[in-house]
């Protein structure tokens, strides 16, 4: 675990992940950058609170929405929250341009390319990866060129 992220375990989310996502959606919908995209949020009810740094979770979700809106026009960006025993999973999906197989494989590694947009995309996902793993979680993505992207991350309900 990175030293500068090691303090995350001591932070606590006040409220549920669902509450945090509703707040992010409300704040993000006021941004003029949505490019005529619809931002949709679906959450599973009854999920317990988790131990997490809310500022870092907001950073991750906001970055994922920003990536989605940058690659989607006149489409839909969906944030979903689901739970299974011991874990809560957030997915930010879009109906945008999607990624090539090479880009998808390297996105979480912080791969830097000469392509300016690819560099920005890869570094942002790398930072998200670092934050989620510092919380004891995992992050992965699915994407296909021309069909959009889904970025998932799961967080443990109990501290690991």
Where are these regions (language model features)?
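Conserved catalytic submotifs in the C-terminal HATPase_c
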Residues: 13-14, 38-48
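Short alpha-helical Gxxx[C/S/T] motif in the catalytic ATP-binding
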Residues: 124, 128
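Short beta-strand/loop element within the Bergerat-fold HATPase_c
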Residues: 76-86
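Short conserved segment of the HATPase_c
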Residues: 99-111
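Conserved micro-motifs of the catalytic ATP-binding
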Residues: 5-11, 49-52
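Short helix-loop "hinge" at the ATP-lid/N-box region of the Bergerat-fold HATPase_c
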Residues: 68-69
């Amino acid at each position: 675990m990175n030293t500068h992220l090691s303090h995350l375990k001591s932070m606590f989310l006040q409220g549920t992940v669902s509450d945090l996502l509703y707040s992010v959606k409300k704040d993000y919908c006021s941004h003029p950058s949505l490019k005529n995209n619809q931002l949709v949020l679906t959450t599973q009810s009854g999920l317990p609170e988790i131990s997490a740094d809310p500022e870092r979770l907001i950073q991750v979700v906001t970055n994922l929405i920003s990536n989605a809106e940058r690659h989607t026009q006149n489409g839909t960006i969906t944030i979903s929250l689901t739970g299974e025993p011991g874990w809560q999973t957030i997915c930010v999906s879009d109906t945008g341009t999607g990624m090539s197989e090479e880009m998808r494989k390297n996105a979480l590694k912080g791969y830097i390319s000469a392509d300016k947009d690819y560099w920005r995309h890869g570094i942002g996902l790398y930072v998200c990866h670092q934050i989620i793993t510092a919380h004891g979680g995992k992050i992965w993505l699915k994407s296909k060129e021309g069909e959009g992207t889904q970025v998932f991350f799961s967080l443990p309900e109990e501290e690991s």
